[in-house]
């Protein structure tokens, strides 16, 4: 092991700020912003610039901004609530404001998830923001580095030196202390979505969490697309904290898991992100392929997020996630709808709808023929899809003929169990412009290919095309993203008989 760098924290922080600002001028360091009140005033200025036409040259009064400030705090009590609110309607978060002096009611955009490296999005860095204690029990705090998107604190970076006790865990404990003390609560820092922790040599990231729910097992290290580990904070910053990557990470690759008893903000592993982006690239070229990810590494979540995000991409008319019939029965509708809080889940809605399963053939066929701009996501089985297609062939052949010319993307979880090569060929005849992406932990290669069945594909490559991303069991064990093996040697012949 080489000699560890003893760079003091202050210099480490300054080096990181300089690096972020040097990346094509994407981030701007705001040395003039020193306190929370400075951040609120900066946000007010950004809101006024963004909404200049709506304000009609009548800038916000103090009382108007006080109401906006109160609404932001009311909607961001937890990181989950903040994430849900920031996503807003079609990626834009807004507030409705009744203007003073009888100027009427207007809607102001506060934050955008879709204006990445463009539009009115701004990217600013603040350093050592002071949080003064509000009572005798509290302690005054200063936060290392905070990244503002659209004026709101979104990413908090906590740095320790390479010689710090417990390494990167020391930075984690600092974040944990902030949360336990309520340091972020009732402040503009309630909008934080992501924590980055580093001791310079080791860097981890994780989704923001409320008091009592932060767990170090959800700290993830970064890997490149070819699975090279990225540990150093400077290399991590180049790859993950650049624009638009940082904005994409918090807007597209964070998941809202919502159940009656639990509301959790989650962030994807790097291998999940790389797989999704590889699918995007292939789909844009109408090329199929498959993802080889280790069993137990979260393929179903990856495939679902792929399906959801593809539905929002231009050039794609419909996305359908296919599962094995037993998997859909076992996982049930709620397993998917808990990750789709931004969607309606009723089969009778026409826009922004998640449809899971549905035993009603007519309902599924109606979903298939929705307009491509409707952002409908379908999760179903090959058997139910076949019945829906048969229904359209019999009842609405004209509608089915229209679908033949559409770019339909199929995401297939456990791609050899969910659909056979023959079934897939049959569906391709109905949807000739479709592209297919399979997920598997156990690809079929030439050496273990299926027995001959006429002209049908016998390997994963033959059925789906090139492998688009790999994350093997070796990688997964290194990261701790799957459980290790317990090996026990059992003898079939008693030792005395050998």
Question: What are these regions, as identified by a protein language model?
Answer:
Residues 195-198, 378-381, 410, 435-440:
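Structural recognition of the conserved hydrophobic beta-strand(s) that form the central parallel beta-sheet
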Residues 149, 284-287, 370-374, 390-408:
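Short basic/glycine-enriched coil/helix segment immediately N-terminal to the Walker B
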Residues 294-295, 414-417, 430-449, 480:
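Conserved helicase ATPase motor motifs in RecA-like P-loop NTPase domains
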Residues 232, 449-498:
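Interdomain helical connector at the RecA1-RecA2 junction of SF1/SF2 helicase-like NTPases
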Residues 332, 388-393, 415-425, 449:
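Conserved ATPase-coupling elements of RecA-like P-loop NTPase cores
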Residues 358-378, 402:
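Conserved motor-coupling elements within RecA-like helicase/translocase cores
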Residues 2-318, 327-343, 372-373, 383, ...:
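ATP-dependent helicase/translocase motor core
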Residues 399-437:
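SF2 helicase catalytic motif II
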């Amino acid at each position: 092991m080489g000699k560890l760098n003893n760079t003091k924290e202050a210099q480490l922080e300054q080096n990181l700020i300089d690096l972020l600002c040097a990346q094509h001028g994407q981030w701007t360091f705001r040395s003039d912003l020193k306190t929370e009140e400075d951040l609120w005033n900066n946000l007010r200025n950004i809101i006024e610039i963004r909404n200049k036409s709506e304000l009609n040259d009548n800038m916000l009064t103090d009382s108007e901004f006080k109401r906006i400030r109160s609404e932001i705090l009311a909607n961001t009590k937890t990181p989950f609530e903040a994430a849900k609110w920031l996503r807003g309607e079609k990626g834009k978060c807004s507030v409705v404001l009744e203007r003073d002096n009888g100027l009427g009611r207007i809607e102001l955009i506060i934050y955008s998830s879709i204006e990445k490296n463009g539009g009115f999005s701004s990217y600013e860095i603040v350093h050592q923001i002071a949080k003064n204690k509000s009572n005798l029990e509290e302690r005054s705090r200063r936060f290392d580095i905070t990244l503002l998107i659209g004026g709101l604190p979104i990413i908090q970076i906590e740095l320790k030196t390479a010689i710090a006790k417990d390494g990167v865990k020391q930075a984690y404990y600092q974040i944990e202390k902030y949360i336990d003390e309520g340091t972020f609560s009732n402040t503009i820092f309630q909008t934080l979505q992501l924590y980055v922790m580093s001791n310079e040599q080791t860097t981890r990231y994780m989704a923001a969490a409320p008091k009592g729910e932060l767990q170090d097992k959800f700290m993830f290290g970064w890997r490149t697309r070819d699975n090279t580990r990225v540990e150093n904070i400077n290399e991590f910053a180049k790859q993950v904290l650049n624009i638009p990557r940082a904005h994409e990470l918090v807007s597209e690759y964070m998941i809202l898991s919502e159940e009656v008893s639990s509301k959790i903000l989650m962030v994807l592993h790097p291998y999940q992100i790389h797989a999704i982006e590889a699918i995007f690239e292939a789909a844009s070229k109408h090329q199929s392929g498959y993802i080889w990810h280790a069993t137990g590494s979260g393929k179903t979540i990856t495939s679902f997020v792929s399906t959801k995000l593809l539905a929002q991409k231009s050039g794609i008319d419909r996305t359908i996630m296919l599962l094995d019939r037993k998997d859909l029965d076992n996982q049930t509708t709620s397993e998917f709808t808990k990750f789709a809080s931004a969607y309606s889940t009723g089969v009778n809605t026409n826009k922004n709808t998640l449809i899971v399963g549905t035993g009603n053939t007519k309902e599924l066929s109606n979903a298939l023929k929705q307009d491509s701009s409707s952002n409908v996501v379908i999760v179903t089985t090959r058997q139910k899809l076949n019945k829906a297609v048969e229904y359209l062939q019999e009842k609405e052949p004209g509608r089915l003929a229209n679908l033949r010319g559409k770019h339909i993307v199929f995401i297939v979880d456990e791609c050899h169990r969910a659909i056979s090569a023959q079934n897939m060929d049959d569906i391709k005849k109905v949807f000739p412009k479709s592209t297919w992406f399979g997920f598997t932990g156990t690809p079929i290669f030439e050496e273990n290919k299926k027995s001959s069945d006429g002209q049908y594909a016998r390997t994963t490559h033959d059925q789906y095309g090139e492998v688009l991303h790999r994350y093997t069991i070796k990688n997964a064990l290194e990261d701790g993203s799957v459980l290790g093996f317990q090996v026990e040697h059992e003898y079939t012949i008693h030792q005395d008989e050998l």
